[in-house]
């Protein structure tokens, strides 16, 4: 892997893409230290360490720790993710949008523009909601001296957060276009990873004071390493469906006759279902948690808190659900069967046409079942281990680990494809799932 990474840096274009990505991510981290005007950061951080403030943990995680600093990126990029989920649902139920989605590159460009506008509008609503229901509550308990809750303060918060979201979207698009990997995923990835070191140092401090057992900490680290290895193996695992192309003789030339395969991954949906699950889970927490004096709304926020059994159960269900939904969107057996028949290909032992469609659907449904169950298990296990060891860290939650591994592998896969085009050895070894054709 080190050899492959060194090879990547030897290619000027690839080196420029990697450096550009790192520079944009560094700029994103610098934004974490630009606070929203008028907000008392010390009081917010003190509140988030309490039991009541702990419910904001998942929001703080996906903002990369920006929520506890209430920087210009306090909302992170999750408003855009939520808007993307809403837009995908609308595309399936609104005929005009469905038609637009089938109009090629131009249609997708327009839908992406709608999603950006929706993300910024949602960010404006969330900024106003936080300014009025959270920051300005109880006479402005989280405001600096000289500031008071009112229209001017609300305006400042909304403008600051909208500018932050717009800047994050611009950064994400620049990474996707000129860098390596998916910009949106990498921003979430960077936000989670930078929280690891403070969490580890905090845990070491607890070990020194005797609040955390050293053996429990080592057991926790061993589990994290094993979880990484298991997730990487599953993300790479694939089932290869053999494909044979019929031979055609045209004059003195023979065309076709090659044997190849269709790779179907155990987790074909990648990291998107996990990010979508986190975005959906944040909505009720975000809407209910700011109302500290309302026991009903606090009960709702605690119910969806992923550190609680109820919230963890919902999180697992959402991961499994979105894995099925997104796999269905990504993998179309009918389109693949039509493509095979058009080019004279067939799966040995399976007739072309409808039998091929049903065969591929059967294979995908089985792989998706095991892949979804694995993702659900990995979402669940870290929380159980944290409860057993007494080491509680939202940064090392199952959903956080899944996103880190998924985004890292997707990015390495893009780098590898660039290396393979230039006849270099890649990063990743291929996993294989052996099975019968039926």
Swiss-Prot record:
InterPro entries named among the record's database cross-references: SecY, SecY/SEC61-alpha, SecY_CS, SecY_dom_sf
Periplasmic compartment segments: 35-56, 131-157, 202-214, 289-303, 390-392
Cellular compartments annotated: Cell inner membrane
Gene Ontology terms: biological process: intracellular protein transmembrane transport; protein targeting; protein transport by the Sec complex
Spans within the Cytoplasmic topological domain: 1-18, 88-114, 176-182, 232-271, 324-372, 409-438
Membrane topology classification: Multi-pass membrane protein
Keyword Amino-acid biosynthesis: no
Intramembrane features from the record: 57-67, 68-71, 72-87
UniProt xrefs under Pfam families: SecY
Transmembrane feature ranges: 19-34, 57-87, 115-130, 158-175, 183-201, 215-231, 272-288, 304-323, 373-389, 393-408
Complex formation: Component of the Sec protein translocase complex. Heterotrimer consisting of SecY, SecE and SecG subunits. The heterotrimers can form oligomers, although 1 heterotrimer is thought to be able to translocate proteins. Interacts with the ribosome. Interacts with SecDF, and other proteins may be involved. Interacts with SecA.
Function, as annotated: The central subunit of the protein translocation channel SecYEG. Consists of two halves formed by TMs 1-5 and 6-10. These two domains form a lateral gate at the front which open onto the bilayer between TMs 2 and 7, and are clamped together by SecE at the back. The channel is closed by both a pore ring composed of hydrophobic SecY resides and a short helix (helix 2A) on the extracellular side of the membrane which forms a plug. The plug probably moves laterally to allow the channel to open. The ring and the pore may move independently.
Official protein name in the record: Protein translocase subunit SecY
Organism: Thermus thermophilus (strain ATCC 27634 / DSM 579 / HB8)
Gene name in the database record: secY
């Amino acid at each position: 892997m080190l050899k492959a990474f060194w090879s990547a840096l030897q290619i000027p274009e690839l080196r420029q893409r990697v450096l550009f990505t790192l520079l944009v991510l560094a700029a994103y981290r610098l934004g974490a230290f630009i606070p929203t005007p008028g907000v008392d950061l010390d009081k917010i951080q003190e509140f988030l360490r309490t039991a009541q403030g702990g419910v904001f943990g998942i929001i703080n995680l996906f903002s990369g720790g920006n929520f506890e600093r209430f920087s210009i990126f306090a909302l992170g990029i999750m408003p855009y993710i939520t808007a993307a989920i809403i837009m995908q649902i609308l595309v399936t139920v609104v005929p005009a949008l469905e038609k637009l989605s089938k109009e090629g590159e131009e249609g997708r460009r327009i839908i992406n523009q709608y999603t950006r506008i929706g993300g910024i509008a949602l960010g404006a609503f969330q900024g106003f909601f936080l300014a009025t229901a959270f920051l300005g509550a109880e006479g402005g308990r989280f405001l600096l001296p000289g500031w008071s809750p009112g229209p001017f303060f609300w305006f400042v918060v909304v403008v600051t957060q909208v500018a932050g979201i717009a800047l994050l979207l611009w950064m994400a698009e620049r990474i996707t276009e000129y860098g390596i990997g998916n910009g949106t995923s990498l921003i979430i990835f960077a936000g989670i990873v930078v929280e690891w070191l403070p969490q580890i140092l905090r845990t070491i401090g607890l070990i020194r004071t005797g609040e955390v057992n050293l053996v429990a900490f080592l057991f926790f680290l061993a589990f994290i390493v094993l979880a990484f290895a298991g997730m990487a193996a599953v993300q790479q695992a694939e089932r290869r469906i053999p494909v044979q192309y019929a031979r055609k003789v045209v004059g003195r030339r023979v065309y076709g006759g090659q044997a190849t395969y269709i790779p179907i991954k155990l987790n074909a949906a990648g990291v998107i279902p996990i990010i979508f699950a986190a975005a959906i889970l944040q909505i009720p927490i975000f809407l209910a948690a700011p109302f500290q004096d309302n026991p009903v709304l606090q009960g709702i926020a605690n119910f969806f808190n992923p550190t609680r059994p109820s919230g963890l159960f919902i999180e697992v269900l959402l991961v499994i659900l979105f894995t099925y939904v997104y796999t269905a969107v990504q993998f179309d057996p009918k389109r693949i069967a039509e493509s095979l028949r058009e080019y004279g290909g067939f799966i040995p032992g399976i007739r072309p046409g409808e039998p091929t469609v049903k065969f591929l659907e059967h294979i995908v449904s089985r792989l998706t079942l095991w892949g979804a169950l694995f993702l659900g298990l990995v979402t669940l296990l870290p929380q159980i281990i944290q409860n057993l060891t007494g080491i509680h860290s939202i940064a090392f939650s199952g959903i956080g680990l899944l996103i880190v591994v998924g985004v890292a592998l997707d990015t390495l896969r893009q780098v590898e494809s660039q290396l393979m085009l230039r006849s270099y050895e890649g990063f990743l070894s291929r996993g294989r799932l052996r099975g019968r054709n039926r």
